[in-house]
Structure formats: structure tokens, C-alpha cells
Amino acid sequence: LHSGRVYNASGSIPTGGVVTSYGNTVSGIYDNILVFGGRAKLTNAYNGITTKWSDESHSFVNTANYISPRSNLTSTGLVDASLGIGGIYNGTILNTTDFYNGTVWSTLTGMSTARESHSSIGNVDSALTVGGRTATDITDKSEIFNGATWSNLSNIPIKIKKATLNGKAYDALLSAGEDASGYQMKSFRQLGDIWYTVGDVNIPRTYHSASGTSTNAKLIGGISNVGS
């Protein structure tokens, strides 16, 4: 039960669009979400009140940077104020930051470190991005976006990709994922610009999802080398 009503996730999922495309990303809240990226170049929106999917065929500003599909990017924000961050296109790992205002996309200042399979949390005015894979290695770099520019923060304690982030910028929880040695169980808490080691997750995993805050988080699914 949410906000006095029962959530009913019905409506047909579009076929052949971004929702079913590998490597896409999602922003928004449970009954109002935006799906974009992946191997399709569409943007799909979902309204949980009307239980309807729609193809958002709005024009893309700066087509050189976002008219093409891209995989393994991340997103933060809401349906009418969302960021698309990094990813990979045609074998090139990107540092791009794209802003969706509910109608059109535009390109903002890029990250210092181009990356894919990274982790992001926050909103369009305070977005934290950590880890991921660069052209040469898995990275431990951490950056913060203030709505206009990116700034480097303290490195996370591990070079990790495909981890999850809970919470918000400067108060985040980084969990599991994959480093050079394999799947990980480690978790780290960010307080301000300092990262602390906290308790391990129950099993090593990657490609998982997460929900909650930095102090009350849930990990969901994923791939593990200990069961499934």
C-alpha cells in the first residue's frame, strides 16, 4: 500500500522498444518511471496511476551525443528531471551526461572518467557516480555532479563494477558487484567524503538490484557463484 492506494503494475510492456532492450537504465519512482538507453534509442515512460506504457517520441537535442543507443549507463532523478550517465556505444566507453526535462534531452558537462557498468544515485542537482569499467581497467574513481559540473571525490575502497548504490550523495551504501578477482560481498558506507567498510552482504553477487537507504537497504536478485 502506497499513498493510500494499492499499486497495480498492469498494462502491456512495449515490444521491440527500450524496455526490452539489453543494457538500459531506469529512473523515477515506483508508479512513474522512465526507461532509456540499451540497444534501442527510444525513451519509454510508465504511469502507474493509469497503468499505461507510452513511447516518448520527443526530439533529442544534440543528436551527436544521444541519438544513438548506449548500454550499461546509469540514471538518477525523476521522469521529468533525469540524468543519463556514461555507458558504452560501439565499443567506446563514454563520459557523457545527458539531461531529460520531461520533453527533450540535452547534453551537459561530461564526467572526468569515462565509464560503463558503474553505479549512480541521487538527483539531477546532486548525483554520485562511482566505480565501473574504463577503457583500461575497473576503476575506484568517485565523482559528484552539482547540476552543472562534475567534481572528483575520495576514491571508493575497491575497484568495482556492477555494484549497487543506496541512499543519496554523501550518505550512500555501495554493495557487492564484481572486481578483478570475481563477484564480491563487500559493502561500504559513505559519510560526507569518507568511505567506511561495513558488513558484507550474504552472498557474492553481481547484476543485482537494490532499494532503500544507506542504513536500511535491500538487495534483489543478481548472479552469484554461490547458488542463485
Explain the meaning of each model-derived region.
Residues 1-228:
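Kelch-like beta-propeller repeat domains
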